[in-house]
């Protein structure tokens, strides 16, 4: 027997006081893409824009009921630094039950085309501000650009809320109706029927594979990449000094190819709070992937896709042999619906942070000016300012 003295309690955990009564709070929708405590700038500037865009979505979904649904703080609120989706509890139950057939039908039809339209509109907003010479804009104009692009990101998110349900519902219906036929065909997991499509994420991986194959053809570059950790490669990439192991021509071409990769596939974000660096800034994971391919530790994405496509088509034929007549027509209809919408869902989420690299470049420009003027001590201090502090600076 051991006698152990308990340590005295010196600090009590913070009390989670709810901002409003009779309000439901959940980590759903956009709050899922904000898993960490948000910075003061996002809490006071970003969340205001998020709520403005979300209010339009709620009006679109619930019509006149939206006003009763929305809490005083808006659809999203902060509790102890974390963002939560919120709604007035009693009106929510009534509103969900009274969702119009029109709203449901719109969410389930033409989802891919509507996502492509939302994507194009968001891309146009980004392009408009990317073309502006940032060094010639004053602070007020840059601030306007940050808010415009982020509002575009929020509107894009609200638009895809009317497209993503088609992917999940089509997969659910397909599985429910044909799980028995799949089992009889020896297929235990129907998700095999939705794999192997050329999503943006897969295209990105194939591009990295191509970069590794090109590097193999340049012995000195290949040796350099294998011999150095990804952190060192990232440092050298950002440096103006040429690595001793690689010729200038090869290094210039290497940097050009990497920059082209980031231009095509780096327009995304790890988190929706714009205080977090994007893949274009954190180079290490990209170089780790290339190193894995070079060292033959990573699977060839081209071969993997071919294997998935082969297995998918084989599974389709095996299930078709188990059914006939009207069930076969229904199977093909639901299958094609699920196969059209599943890649769209992945691509839509991938592009949520499409504007974040530009937003962070604009914030960097303002931060450098504040640093030069002595308003802040470090570049990242800008994210710890509130909206009021920011305007005052």
Predicted regions and their residues:
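Contiguous hydrophobic, helix-prone segments at protein termini
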Residues: 5-393
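Feature captures the catalytic cores and cofactor-binding loops of soluble hydro-lyases/lyases
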Residues: 1
């Amino acid at each position: 027997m051991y006698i152990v003295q308990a340590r005295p309690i010196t600090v009590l955990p913070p009390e989670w006081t709810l901002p409003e009564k009779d309000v439901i709070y959940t980590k759903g929708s956009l709050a899922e893409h904000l898993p960490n405590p948000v910075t003061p700038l996002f809490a006071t500037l970003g969340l205001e824009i998020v709520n403005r865009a979300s209010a339009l979505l709620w009006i679109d979904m619930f019509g006149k009921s939206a006003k009763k649904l929305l809490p005083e703080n808006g659809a999203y609120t902060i509790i102890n630094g974390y963002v939560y989706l919120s709604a007035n509890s009693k009106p929510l139950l009534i509103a969900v039950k009274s969702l119009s057939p029109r709203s449901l039908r719109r969410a389930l039809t033409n989802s891919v085309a509507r996502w492509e339209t939302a994507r194009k509109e968001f891309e146009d907003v980004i392009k408009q501000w990317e073309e502006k010479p940032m060094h010639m804009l004053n602070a007020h104009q840059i601030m306007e650009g940050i808010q415009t692009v982020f509002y575009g990101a929020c509107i894009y998110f609200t638009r895809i809320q009317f497209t993503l349900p088609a992917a999940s519902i089509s997969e659910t219906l397909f599985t429910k109706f044909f799980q028995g036929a799949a089992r009889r065909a020896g297929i235990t997991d129907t998700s095999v029927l939705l794999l192997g499509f050329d999503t943006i994420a897969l295209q990105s991986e194939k591009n990295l594979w191509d970069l590794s194959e090109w590097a193999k053809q340049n012995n000195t570059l290949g040796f350099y990449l294998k011999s150095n950790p990804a952190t060192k490669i990232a440092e050298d990439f950002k440096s103006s000094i040429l690595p001793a192991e690689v010729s200038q021509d090869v290094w210039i071409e290497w940097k050009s190819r990497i920059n082209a990769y980031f231009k095509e596939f780096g327009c995304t974000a790890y988190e929706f709070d714009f205080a977090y660096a994007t893949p274009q800034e954190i180079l290490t994971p990209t170089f780790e992937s290339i190193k894995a391919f070079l060292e033959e530790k990573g699977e060839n994405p081209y071969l993997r896709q071919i294997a998935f496509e082969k297995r998918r088509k084989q599974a389709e034929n095996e299930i078709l042999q188990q059914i006939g007549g009207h069930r076969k027509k229904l199977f093909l209809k639901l299958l094609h619906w699920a196969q059209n919408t599943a890649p769209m869902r992945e691509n839509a989420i991938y592009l949520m942070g499409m504007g974040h690299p530009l937003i962070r470049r604009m914030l960097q420009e303002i931060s450098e000016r504040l640093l030069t003027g002595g308003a802040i001590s470090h570049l990242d201090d800008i994210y710890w300012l509130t909206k009021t502090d920011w305007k005052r600076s």
